[in-house]
């Protein structure tokens, strides 16, 4: 068994007289891929929003001179809801200011939580429901009542996160591993959710997959393809992109406030439909995402600085049971 380096998660409030600490981070490498990640930390962490899972925000992944992930925004502002355009800048709010392939879980226990009570976001913790909240808002920062017990173990080519939380009637152990596959330009994101309580866990999760390939704006030469004929009741702006059978093809460079977004329907419950290819002939690189669970739904969203294909899966975990899922990312170059 390999010995990992245990990294303490700093959840206590530090002395105000100390200088601001840099966000804790880690680096993993398999000689083909190099990835850099921010670590979960309630005080000094890079991401402190209450929308996305805190376990391992990948802010850089390099392969053959290409970089796949990085900030899609120029700066952040705690007063922004989602993001805005401010002159030439894209300004992200605290819940959206994140990078790379990040997971967002649907909240647990929101409806039954009383004002001031607690609800759950897996990968974040038990959050406080405001007194004036009518419905859940994933762009709002909620107070964290209990972050749970976190641990991180780092190896040369992988990093393991775990969070145990007992709150709001739920008790679970969540694990996530970012693993670079030996001898291959591939990264696996391996997840498990074990129900340690007496209440069933019913939720869903998707990966936002913020892709900023070499920081080129989406445009002609960029395609998204899947194994099924894409159907959409809200197709993209026909001047910017179009659906062609199983592909979405970009027709013009996204600029200013351009948006290409569409639901991607037409898949079946076969696991083989959970596969995505994104290729850009302008930069000569691409990636394939393949998962081992059937799709619940899928959508595409892109602006001038980023493209994101968002696959959802359903999660149902009975008391005492464990649910696992894995997504494999393959990175490659294209022959020009």
Q: Can you say where each PLM-predicted feature lies in the sequence?
A:
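Bacterial N-terminal signal peptides that target proteins for export
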Residues: 1-9
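Short, intrinsically disordered low-complexity segments
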Residues: 1-2, 14, 175
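Bacterial N-terminal signal peptides
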Residues: 8-16
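Surface-exposed acidic/polar loop and edge beta-strand patches at domain peripheries
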Residues: 22-188, 196-204, 208-336
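Intrinsic disorder/low-complexity segments
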Residues: 13, 21-22
């Amino acid at each position: 068994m390999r010995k990992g380096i245990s990294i303490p998660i700093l959840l206590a409030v530090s002395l105000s007289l100390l200088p601001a600490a840099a966000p804790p981070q880690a680096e993993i490498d398999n000689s083909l891929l190099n990835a850099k990640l921010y670590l979960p930390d309630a005080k000094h962490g890079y991401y402190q929003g209450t929308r996305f899972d805190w376990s391992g925000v990948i802010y850089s992944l390099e392969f053959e001179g290409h970089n796949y992930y990085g900030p899609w925004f120029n700066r952040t502002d705690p007063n922004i809801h989602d993001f805005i355009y401010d002159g030439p800048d894209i300004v992200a709010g605290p819940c959206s200011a994140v990078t790379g392939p990040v997971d967002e879980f649907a909240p647990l226990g929101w409806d039954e939580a009383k004002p001031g009570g607690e609800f759950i976001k897996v990968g974040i913790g038990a959050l406080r429901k405001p007194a004036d909240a009518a419905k859940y808002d994933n762009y709002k920062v909620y107070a964290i009542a209990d972050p749970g017990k976190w641990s991180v173990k780092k190896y040369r080519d992988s990093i393991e996160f775990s969070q145990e939380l007992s709150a709001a009637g739920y008790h679970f152990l969540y694990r996530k591993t970012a693993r670079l596959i030996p001898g291959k330009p591939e990264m696996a994101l391996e997840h498990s959710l074990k129900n340690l309580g007496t209440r069933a866990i019913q939720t869903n999760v998707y990966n936002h997959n913020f892709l900023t390939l070499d920081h080129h704006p989406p445009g002609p030469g960029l395609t998204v393809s899947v194994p099924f004929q894409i159907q959409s009741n809200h197709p993209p702006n026909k001047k910017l992109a179009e659906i062609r059978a199983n592909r979405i093809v970009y027709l013009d460079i996204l600029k200013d406030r351009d948006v290409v977004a569409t639901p991607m329907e037409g898949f079946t419950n076969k696991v083989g439909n959970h596969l995505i290819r994104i290729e850009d002939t302008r930069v000569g690189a691409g990636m394939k995402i393949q998962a081992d669970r059937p799709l619940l739904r899928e959508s595409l969203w892109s602006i001038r600085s980023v493209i994101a294909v968002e696959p959802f899966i359903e999660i149902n975990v009975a008391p005492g049971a464990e649910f696992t899922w894995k997504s494999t990312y393959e990175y490659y170059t294209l022959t020009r």
